[in-house]
Amino acid sequence: MPLSYQHFRKLLLLDDEAGPLEEELPRLADEGLNRRVAEDLNLGNLNVSIPWTHKVGNFTGLYSSTVPVFNPEWQTPSFPHIHLQEDIINRCQQYVGPLTVNEKRRLKLIMPARFYPNLTKYLPLDKGIKPYYPEHAVNHYFKTRHYLHTLWKAGILYKRETTRSASFCGSPYSWEQELQHGRLVFQTSTRHGDESFCSQSSGILSRSPVGPCVRSQLTQSRLGLQPQQGSLARGKSGRSGSIRARVHPTTRRSFGVEPAGSGRIDNRASSTSSCLHQSAVRKTAYSHLSTSKRQSSSGHAVELHNIPPSSARPQSEGPILSCWWLQFRNSKPCSDYCLTHIVNLLEDWGPCTEHGEHNIRIPRTPARVTGGVFLVDKNPHNTTESRLVVDFSQFSRGSTHVSWPKFAVPNLQSLTNLLSSNLSWLSLDVSAAFYHIPLHPAAMPHLLVGSSGLPRYVARLSSTSRNINYQHGTMQDLHDSCSRNLYVSLLLLYKTFGRKLHLYSHPIILGFRKIPMGGGLSPFLLAQFTSAICSVVRRAFPHCLAFSYMDDVVLGAKSVQHLESLFTSITNFLLSLGIHLNPNKTKRWGYSLNFMGYVIGCWGTLPQEHIVLKIKQCFRKLPVNRPIDWKVCQRLVGLLGFAAPFTQCGYPALMPLYACIQSKQAFTFSPTYKAFLCKQYLNLYPVARQRSGLCQVFADATPTGWGLAIGHSRMRGTFVAPLPIHTAELLAACFARRRSGAKLIGTDNSVVLSRKYTSFPWLLGCAANWILRGTSFVYVPSALNPADDPSRGRLGLYRPLLHLPFRPTTGRTSLYAVFLSVPSHLPVRVHFASPLHVAWRPP
């Protein structure tokens, strides 16, 4: 007869009318009983012949791809001008006095952040924007391109101008100013009727131009002239020390050469102003040029700047038609849906490319991307705005993966010990937190995103994947991309983007100037940054508890009035550092804080209501006696595992599911096991804050017997059959808890101390979790354990009772720096463990 739910509860000793614990509990460690129960509950029968179920409620399993939904009405979020102050350490020190070594180290890590993987795979530009929405390809292309443009304008991205130069918007940092052009010297030389450009800019690392002027350039370094050198100092080489110039045969056009206006510009201003002046010069120089893409013989996409035959060419003569978009202007419409109709809507489509306010030199950057991008909803609650997803997963996969640094995240018990108090709470919203942290320009070649331009994108998606060579093709080739779909999409997009359609149809390569969300290093850097800032805030405002996890920052104070005044001061302090807060999203929680998916109050911690609701819905839709695909089980365990610490039996109750996931088999829920889990998750118990105290109850065991020391009394007992030592120690701890009711027990067994009961026999693990719930353990060495003698059957011998103090654990999260640590005379090493003591105790 199958095991009923009531019998199963009695078996697990979850009901009060069970027999004496010393007899009942060791029985649960019996292998035979565990096997019989598993068979009764159908837990071990993983090989099933019935087809697997691949969907349970919202959880999808194998062979199902969740198709993201494209929203044609997506708005691109606006980004404030985020500029984290470079002298953040000095500013903090002015505010709070000298910083600890730990805080300084963390803040130096992000000023600027560095990211240099061993190996970077470069992907063709076609893979820049992922074809996630084939039905809305063109719309997705322009929305993504607009998002990237917005990020560039906000100073979050660099734009690759040439192989060795990039431009950006926003305020430059000192490490960027060192790389700016000190001086710009243009010289035009005319010989043998061959007019060519000879650019001698000290910042843009263009390849040597073509023509007779090359000879004079051979003496120059690849890096160009330095600001302090003479305006035409020929013989000296620059920083690189190597004199290498690539000479192109005169017949070929030069790629990536910086174009110059006629005449000579010699600007001796400071680097910043020269940089601004230069960008203005570059704009005029570029205004009559157009950039396009062309497939070179090696199949690489190369930027081609078509230089007009005369440098003094008047701008009124119109653009040179190498631009795919503008070529339609001079062509006859091929049909009613020809793009010519759209191009003729406007007289002035604006420039082909835009250039940033500042220019810097960068390491050699190919015309490639290292990760694809696509758009999704900003979050489940906000589907009107889009979010850019950047896929830099190449750095986390395969043989070339980078192992990211580990950092301390408080576990549930530590979090409860830290934050469970009768304080009043509010949480701050840091807007675009990742985009606060600047990246060194040398990391740019590893973090490239971009697009190959509209024609290539459309050609790749069209059924006849023609290799469009629109540089030397006929006009007919140009019209190959005309189609009704493209025409209708562009007409609708014209209402949104206007003349920007032209700009966005061009290829572009962008590198990250601030840390991207998709980089494996980013969470670590963000955690270091916010935890250092909170540490400074706690010292500056001793009566305030500031705590952060990633971009979630919470402030706690004794009263609401106190909290409000602290909020004003702290907000001003953070704004002075350049940290952008979103005042509309500041949440005031009262006395129960919502943080990291938990509700934390003076009574302890529970999961948030929406998670409890999700679990209830999940059980409602969970089928019985039907094999469920292990991928669905994995998602199920993710949800149930989050709330497991709040149930009677905890994680051990989920062990059968873990086993099925590990063996990649289907799992069949029997009615009893489902009812058991259902009841477990319907009644959730808070995880309470641990209290410090003196330990006066000790437990110890040998494979054959157990012993307890409760105050001055001693007890002992024997097992019917010898047991593994860890099992025996766990049983002894359970007996100590049940007999004394103490919440503090001393043990010499590390497994019992760790409170992870998933490796024990299943039934015993479940029962022990319930008996020992809310118990804290203190380690006592075997030699000093007063329960050691009784466990060996010696009751007459009394070891002195130890007074073992217990301090609640806060993991590696230090909440308060009591004093500045004395500098040691040892060589400075980077520590990740916090040397600070936790002096703050929750009230």
From Swiss-Prot:
Site (described: Priming of reverse-transcription by covalently linking the first nucleotide of the (-)DNA): Y63
Pfam families: DNA_pol_viral_C (PF00336), DNA_pol_viral_N (PF00242), RVT_1 (PF00078)
Enzyme Commission number(s) of this protein: 2.7.7.7, 2.7.7.49, 3.1.26.4
Annotated stretches, region: Disordered: 224-243, 253-316
UniProt keyword annotation of Transmembrane present: no
Region Spacer, residue ranges: 178-346
Catalytic activity: DNA(n) + a 2'-deoxyribonucleoside 5'-triphosphate = DNA(n+1) + diphosphate; Endonucleolytic cleavage to 5'-phosphomonoester
This protein's UniProt keywords: DNA replication, DNA-binding, DNA-directed DNA polymerase, Endonuclease, Host-virus interaction, Hydrolase, Inhibition of host innate immune response by virus, Inhibition of host RLR pathway by virus, Magnesium, Metal-binding, Multifunctional enzyme, Nuclease, Nucleotidyltransferase, RNA-directed DNA polymerase, Transferase, Viral immunoevasion
InterPro entries named among the record's database cross-references: DNA/RNA_pol_sf, DNApol_viral_C, DNApol_viral_N, HBV_DPOL, Rev_trsase/Diguanyl_cyclase, RT_dom, Viral_Replic_Matur_Polypro
Keyword Magnesium included in the entry's annotation: yes
Chain spans, region Terminal protein domain (TP): 1-177
Domain of life: Viruses
Region (Polymerase/reverse transcriptase domain (RT)): 347-690
Gene Ontology annotations of biological process type: DNA replication; symbiont-mediated suppression of host innate immune response
Polar residues: compositionally biased ranges: 268-277, 287-299
Free-text activity regulation comment from the record: Activated by host HSP70 and HSP40 in vitro to be able to bind the epsilon loop of the pgRNA. Because deletion of the RNase H region renders the protein partly chaperone-independent, the chaperones may be needed indirectly to relieve occlusion of the RNA-binding site by this domain. Inhibited by several reverse-transcriptase inhibitors: Lamivudine, Adefovir and Entecavir.
GO MF assignments: DNA binding; DNA-directed DNA polymerase activity; metal ion binding; RNA-directed DNA polymerase activity; RNA-DNA hybrid ribonuclease activity
Reverse transcriptase domain sequence ranges: 357-600
Residues that, per the record, bind Mg(2+): D429, D551, D552
PROSITE patterns: RT_POL
Further comment found in the protein's record: Hepadnaviral virions contain probably just one P protein molecule per particle.
Role: Multifunctional enzyme that converts the viral RNA genome into dsDNA in viral cytoplasmic capsids. This enzyme displays a DNA polymerase activity that can copy either DNA or RNA templates, and a ribonuclease H (RNase H) activity that cleaves the RNA strand of RNA-DNA heteroduplexes in a partially processive 3'- to 5'-endonucleasic mode. Neo-synthesized pregenomic RNA (pgRNA) are encapsidated together with the P protein, and reverse-transcribed inside the nucleocapsid.
Family recorded in the similarity comment: Belongs to the hepadnaviridae P protein family.
Protein name: Protein P
Record organism: Hepatitis B virus genotype C subtype adr (strain Japan/adr4/1983) (HBV-C)
Lineage summary: Viruses, Riboviria, Pararnavirae, Artverviricota, Revtraviricetes
